[in-house]
Amino acid sequence: MGQKARSAAAALAVASSEQKNNALEMIALSLEAHSDEILRANCLDLEKATQNNLKAAMVDRLKLDELRLAAMIDSVRQVARLSDPVGQIMSAWTRPNGLHISRVRTPLGVIGIIYESRPNVTIDASSLCLKAGNAVILRGGSDSFHSSYALHCALVQGLEHSGLPKSAIQMVGTTDRAAVGEILKGLDGAIDVIVPRGGKSLVARVQSDARVPVFAHLEGLCHIYIDKSADLDMARNIVLNAKLRRTGICGAVETVLIDNEALKKFLPVLTALQEKGCEIRATEDIAFLVPDVKLASEEDWSHEYLDAILSVKTVEGVEGAISHIKRYSSGHTESIIAEDMEVVKKFFNHLDSAILLHNASTQFADGGEFGFGMEIGIATGKMHARGPIGVEQLTSFQYHIKGNGQVRA
């Protein structure tokens, strides 16, 4: 499998933009042609999820329907419309001796993707890797096995119709956990980068055991700070969206911090959440003012709920918010709601998370919303890829140096 992937990666590295875009269109057409089979396979996974009492957030990630599948197919076509990063000149300069140096984007090579109950990752990872000239080896979880297998069959058929090697997109055909171990070892040097998509335990194992570079985040644990200068209606709309639009994604807010000088002003934000069925866990000063609020424990500040539950705390201005976030944040995404630009500037300058937002929902922490077409994850590390991993983040670079006979003294 590893050697087939390396061979395919070599072919993709020199494939033209037209060839890659044609392959993506063939994949989209194949997915459309096999939609019924894909949805039937997904039903098998959903039945198994029900039998295994899978959590609601996991079931939501697992579920496919006609609308979600259509959106996935559309995202393949969006990737085809993106600029091809391969061959782009990132920077160029000429040295005093006449040497002309260019830094040029190149494919990474072979990407290993390890994921759980997220059949969409099968499509997202394959499309982005193909566009960036990379081969991909997919290892889906047992929860999404039937869905991922059906999607992979359609992907391979699309590749075959395009003329590109079908081994450019391979899937590990077993749910045996030993297969994960082999991928983490790099398949004898075949894999260049691993991207995990799944729960905290999966990502932690990958980061601990991988012998090749990893692009990943351990968990979401996103924060919103509401400053005393914030507009109430804006704060209410943003927090409702950030928590409840989709509770089971890594960009969902888990903790809201409120300026203690304006707590009463923003209590309607909390009552609006409760009216939508959200459980509030908060500090005593908030529980005293808002009915049916549970007292937050120390564990709540570091817990990723992925559910309609929210931790809320009052803080002493933006400095208090920064202090709390630095202590508990996973480095994923933080948002500030404020009209005072000096406060916003301080928030941005003192926090080091991968994504910082001003007056916007944390659920914009998504490659599609960034204009990347789609993403295969959010990276919170500081080396190479950071934030949404889109097509550009799946490239490396070379230095191309042109001379006219220069030799070094």
UniProtKB/Swiss-Prot annotation:
Entry's Gene Ontology molecular function annotations: glutamate-5-semialdehyde dehydrogenase activity; NADP binding
GO cellular component, as recorded: cytoplasm
UniProt keyword terms in alphabetical order: Amino-acid biosynthesis, Cytoplasm, NADP, Oxidoreductase, Proline biosynthesis
A matching Pfam family: Aldedh
SUPFAM superfamilies, alphabetized: ALDH-like
HAMAP family, per database record: ProA
Protein name in UniProt: Gamma-glutamyl phosphate reductase
Recorded name of the encoding gene: proA
